[in-house]
Amino acid sequence: MSGALTIACVEPQMASRIWPKIRDMIDKGYAAGDNFMPEDIVEGIRYGKILVWIAVDEENGHIHAAMTTELVPMRCGLVCWMGQCAGDRMHDWSKFHVEIEKYAKDEGCVKIILKGRRAWERVLEGFRIRTVQLEKLL
């Protein structure tokens, strides 16, 4: 039986403990964009430069999704980059951005940016397409 999901930010000191459980999820997010997972991602997570967010089953503790965020200074001000995200039971955690928006506001961010598939546009309320990435296979 599956329970309700809770969205939680993993404390950097705890991230190394759960990394084996979420590594493949994070890598799946990179793979969806045809990218390799950066070798230094674990170090960034360990030192709190990159935060990990998880969707956890309240009944059995199973992690159903994982995502990364990173605060980045830009010309407009501090920006929260929503990074790689993957998992299952998306309909149960698709409103995760509300928690991340609260976090970003508390940290003084002026906006949130994410790069992903077009399907995210339907899921993330209030987000709009700002740029387009074009590709041509050779």
Question: Where in this protein do the model-derived segments appear?
Answer:
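A generic structural signal for short, solvent-exposed coil/turn residues
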Residues: 1, 45-47, 61, 74, ...
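Terminal substrate-recognition subdomain of acyl/acetyltransferases
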Residues: 1-4, 8-15, 115-138
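Short amphipathic alpha-helix that is part of the acyltransferase structural core
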Residues: 1-36
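N-terminal start-of-chain detector that recognizes signal peptides
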Residues: 23-28, 39-40, 53-58, 84-86, ...
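Active-site rim helix/loop that mediates acceptor-substrate recognition in acyltransferases
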Residues: 30-52
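Short, flexible, glycine/charge-rich loop motifs used to bind or transfer phosphoryl groups or to couple energy/partner
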Residues: 42-43, 70-72, 102
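Conserved donor-binding loop and adjoining core beta-sheet/short helix segment
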Residues: 47-90
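Acyl-donor binding region in acyl/amide transferases
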Residues: 75-126
